[in-house]
């Protein structure tokens, strides 16, 4: 227990400290031809221009143009050129004409009638399954299955009543 106490205290101090206030400057380094990010500056590193973490927007971040790296002796004096592709963000064109909408009551009524039809079909199917379970061959009556089927039939009946009430309000 004593050995875990310092670890717990360190974790609590990390959790309670605001990370945004302690954010360090980030540097980009090119080491052996690979880009590495670090918080410790060195000779081959330069400051990066990264967007802040947690900044949400609908626009994409466009990388700034970086200076070309100096030729390194490891690649035979040839300069490796890398330019980040610059992408322009275009906003979608907005249509001035609103879409044609059908009358709300007619479409709602047709949806409710379709749902009522589906519920009636589901009710007859649930009633068939319940009657088959009650007439089980060999005397093996599964009471849990019968209770679940009865609950299903009751749910369907209540759904039908609710749909009929809703249609009656129109």
From Swiss-Prot:
Ranges annotated as biased composition (Polar residues): 93-107
UniProt note: phenotype after gene disruption: Nonpiliated colony morphology with non-domed, flatter and larger-diameter colonies without dark ring at the endges of the colonies as opposed to wild-type. Reduced DNA transformation competency. Reduced total PilE protein level. Loss of type IV pilus (T4p), however, there are some PilE proteins detected near the bacterial cell surface. Simultaneous pilT deletion restores T4p expression, has higher total PilE protein level than the tfpC single mutant, yet does not restore piliated colony morphology of the wild-type.
Signal peptide bounds: 1-23
Top-level division of the source organism's lineage: Bacteria
Principal location: periplasm
Entry's localization field: Periplasm
Positions of the UniProt region annotated as Disordered: 87-107
Keywords: Coiled coil, Periplasm, Signal
Coiled coil: 109-166
One Gene Ontology CC term in the entry: periplasmic space
A biological-process GO annotation: type IV pilus assembly
Described purpose of this protein according to its UniProt entry: Required for stabilizing type IV pilus (T4p) in extended, nonretracted conformation on the bacterial cell surface.
Protein name: Type IV pilus assembly protein C
Protein's organism: Neisseria gonorrhoeae (strain ATCC 700825 / FA 1090)
């Amino acid at each position: 227990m004593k050995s875990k106490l310092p670890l717990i205290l360190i974790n609590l101090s990390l959790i309670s400290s605001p990370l945004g206030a302690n954010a360090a400057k980030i540097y980009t380094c090119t080491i052996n031809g690979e880009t590495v990010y670090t918080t410790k500056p060195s000779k081959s590193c330069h400051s990066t221009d990264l967007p802040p973490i947690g900044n949400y927007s609908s626009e994409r971040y466009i990388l700034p143009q970086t200076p070309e790296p100096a030729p390194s002796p490891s690649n035979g004096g040839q300069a490796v050129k890398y330019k980040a592709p610059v992408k322009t963000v275009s906003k979608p064109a907005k249509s001035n004409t609103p879409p044609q909408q059908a009358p709300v009551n007619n479409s709602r009524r047709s949806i409710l009638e379709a749902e009522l039809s589906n519920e009636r079909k589901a009710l007859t199917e649930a009633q068939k399954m319940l009657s088959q379970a009650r007439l089980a061959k060999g005397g093996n009556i599964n009471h849990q299955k019968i209770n679940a089927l009865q609950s299903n039939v009751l749910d369907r009946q209540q759904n039908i009543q609710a749909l009929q009430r809703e249609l009656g309000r129109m």
